[in-house]
Each structure stands twice: as structure tokens, then as C-alpha cells.
Amino acid sequence: MANPNLKQVNIQNNATFPHQQNVTRSTESPGDPKETMEAVAPSPQDPSSANSEPQEMTVDIKNFRRPGEKTFTQRCRLFVGNLPSDMADEDFKKLFFKYGDAKEVFINRDRGFGFIRLETRTLAEIAKAELDGTVLGNRPIRIRFATHGAALTVRNLSPVVSNELLEQAFSQFGPVERAIVIVDDRGRPTGKGIVEFANKPAARKALDHCADGALLLTTSPRPVILEPTEQYDDEDGLPEKLLQKSAQYHKEREHKPHFAQPGTFEFEYSSRWKALDEMDKQQREQVERNIQEAKEKLETEMEAAKQEHQLMMMRQDLMRRQEELRRLEELRNQELQKRKQIELRHEEERRRREEDMIRHREQLDIRRQPDGFKSGFMESREQDMRMNEMGTRGAINIGDSFNPVTAISGNQGPTQMMGMGGRVGAMGPDGSSKMIPDNGVMPNERFSEGGPLQMGSPVGGQTGVDSPQPQQHSPMLVGAGSVPGVLGQSGFGRGSPVGGSFDGPNNKRRRY
């Protein structure tokens, strides 16, 4: 059973095959040679079949595609001229049906030409070779490759530029169909290339940008130069059948090609034409040499300037880094100063907190002291106050008269000293104890030289009987005179003006 995806195509070649061949296009399995390419030849046992049946061949159209080749490009576009005026679009498509899919079909019936685009360049070449000169409506058609209006020529290319790099560089302006670096017969780059875009706007954009700016393909500051490609037909050329048979044609074609004989008119002017061509050649060579020398000089200057530029960039980079380091050092110093200030502030705050804590702790210690210590402290304070008052009263009462009867007969109450509940008496020189009278007058035996004070002794001959009056703290005053029977032989040693010198009201006992 035949494959429904295969198409029957007829390829005629009278020089090789005397009979018509049917070529079928396959798109299903290009990898299987049995399915993609079959040649059904006539059987050797039946020689008559070779004359009666045409040869059939199944051809995969993908075999006509080069590796990496793009399809339906401008290079696959054919120009068809001398078409009949009544040519329909469907008939025009059927003309190229056996060569695969076709796109961009255009016909201008008024002027008798059209365009069609096939899948690959190879198929377009096959169609051109087979259909060129085919008679349609008593008119032979002419088929040529259409002019590529979006092709650009690139000059001043570096020797390290490849086809891929060239395509990558110009892809920014639009889709690139083909990019080729032209090389000589030894494969060395000539510094020229061709870039073919898919449409004219992309080519125009590339021309404008490269004319206004400088497109660099490598690190070398060597810009590429773009210009429209000059279209030449170096394949078909100009056949004899296409020449117009004018009067000039017949005049020039009277003589066959021949060499001019020396000494003739033809030889003289032929020599002058050759001399002009030689001068043109020499001038072109001289210009090329001058241009080459200028290029080499520019290359040398460019290398020197490049090194100088690199050194300058290194200096600038070094200065920038030094400036950055200096700025970082300043920032670091400022940060250190800020840290020192913060540390000093924290230290001051810590010291204040410690002082506050110590002060608070002392207050807590004072509040937590026992009651006995507090009462003793208060009594010592009261005793100091009494001593101060006693010194003041003694100084005032030095010249006053003292009534011994009142001092003796008055009721004497006990005086509390230093938090003690017992009576405090004074021992006289005879060993009898004397108490402080109730009238608040201190007997002079307290400061006598006879003996120390004694506690618990009776006052004025009494035997230590408690006074019925309540105990009261009276200020002790120093008397001026001596009382017989109560005081000793000597009175005030220091406070009396008689017994000794008077030190004044500021004479106080030391606290400790």
C-alpha cells in the first residue's frame, strides 16, 4: 500500500534517462533509506517494460536541505518572467507543485512576471534548471533567482570573526537568514562578508545604526563598514537568446574574434587601451599600498594607545581604590570615636548607678539596724545635747547666789543617763553620795577633785530613798558657791573663779 504522504513528482533528464521519472516527496521518515529513497527500475527479464513504463523514484525533500540551512529564505525566491497575461494563481502554483511547498506567490499579469518562494535553495535551483524556457501560451518563460534586497556587504572584518559571530552580531537588528565570511582559495579570511536579512526594514536599520555609530565585533576598536550588496548573476550570465538583435549588434558581430595585427589601426588603439588599463591597475595598486600602510600604522598606534589607555585605567583604578581606602579609614576613625564616646557615656552611667546603689544600700542598712542600737544612738545624741546645755548654763550661773537650804531640802529625782533606769549620784569627799536636786541646780561636787561620781548613793544624808516625784530630765547647771555639809572641800576646779580658771561657755566635754 502506498504512503498517502508521498507525492508523485516528475523529473525529466533526457541526457541520463531516456524515459520520464516520477519523483515522490516524503515527509514521514527521513531516517529510513528504504522509505525515503526507492528506485523502481524495469525488470531485466522484461525489456519491453523499459520502453513502456516510466521509472518511479521516491525522494525525500529533506535530503535536499543542507545541515543547518534555513527554509523559505530570500535565496529560495525565484523570478518568473514572460508569463501569459491570462495566467491564474492556481496554474502558477501547479507549475511548481512537484518541487515541494511554495510560499509568497505573486503575479503581475499586466507586466507578465511573478515571484514564488520554495523551501530550500537546492529545490529552487532544480526548479530553475528544469522550468527555464518552458513554453506557456506560445511564450517561453524565463526563470532567474530574485534579487536579494536585504543583503549587505560587510568590510573591515577582523581575522578572528566567524560566520556564527557575524550572525550573532547582526541579529540585534532583525532576523538573519545567512551570514558568511568570504575567504580566498586557501581558506584565509579576506576581511569581507555578506549578511542577508529576512526583510528590508532590518537591513535598513543595520545600515543606519552602523553609519551613525561604530559596531565592534571584537575587543579591538575596529568598526565594521556596511554597504548594500551589488547583485551579480554569475551563474547564468547573458545567453545568446536573450540578446536584442539591434543594428549595433549586427555591426559589431560582422567579424569573428581575432588578434590584431601589429602596425594596424586596431593594434595601435588596442595598445592604448591596454596602457590605460595598466595605468589604472598601477594606480589602484598604489592606492591599495597606501591604504595598507595607513592601516598598519593605525594598528601600531592603536596598540600603543591601547597599552597607554590600560595604564591610565589602572592608575585611575588605583587612585579610586586609594580614595576609597582613605574614606573607609576616615569612617573607621569616626566609628572608633563614636564607640569611645559611647563607652565613656556607659562608664559614667555605670559609675552613677553604682553610687546610687551604694547610697541605697547604706540607707537600707540604716533602716535595718536593731532597735537597741537606734535607742543608744538617740540617747548618746541626747547626752551630747545635755552637755552642751550644761556648759552654757554653767557659764551663765557663775555669779548667781546659791541657796544651800533649797538645794539640800528639795526633793531630788533620779536622772536617766545613757538609757539606764537607776539613779545617778555623786560621791563626796567623805564617801557620801549626792543626787541632783529637783530645782535643776547641779552641785559643784560633780566637778570636784575629791573623787569620781557614784551611782545609786543618797543625796544630802538620805539613804537612797526614791523621791516620790516622777523622773524628769533637768538641765544640769554649774553652781558658783560652796554649800556646807553637801559639797566637798574643793568646789569647781575649772568652772569656779575661785578654785581655778574659767574657760568660758564653750568648754565642753569630748564626745568620745
UniProtKB/Swiss-Prot annotation:
Q: Give the Gly residues compositional bias ranges.
A: 488-502
UniProt lists compositionally biased (Polar residues) regions at 1-29, 46-55, 464-474
What keywords are assigned to this protein?
Coiled coil, Nucleus, Phosphoprotein, Repeat, RNA-binding
GO molecular function terms listed in the Swiss-Prot or TrEMBL record: RNA binding
Segments for region (Disordered): 1-56, 451-512
- Which sequence ranges form a coiled-coil region, renumbered to this chain? 276-366
According to its UniProt entry, one GO biological process term is: regulation of circadian rhythm
Pfam families recorded: NOPS, RRM_1
GO cellular component, as recorded:
nuclear speck; nucleus
* Residue intervals of the RRM domain: 76-148, 150-231
Name where it's found: Nucleus speckle
Which SUPFAM superfamilies does this chain map to?
Answer: RNA-binding domain, RBD
Carries keyword Nucleus?
Answer: yes
Task: Sum up the protein's function in the record's words.
Answer: RNA-binding protein required for the formation of nuclear paraspeckles. Binds to poly(A), poly(G) and poly(U) RNA homopolymers.
Family membership = Belongs to the PSPC family.
Q: What name goes with this protein?
A: Paraspeckle component 1
Question: What's the name of its gene?
Answer: pspc1
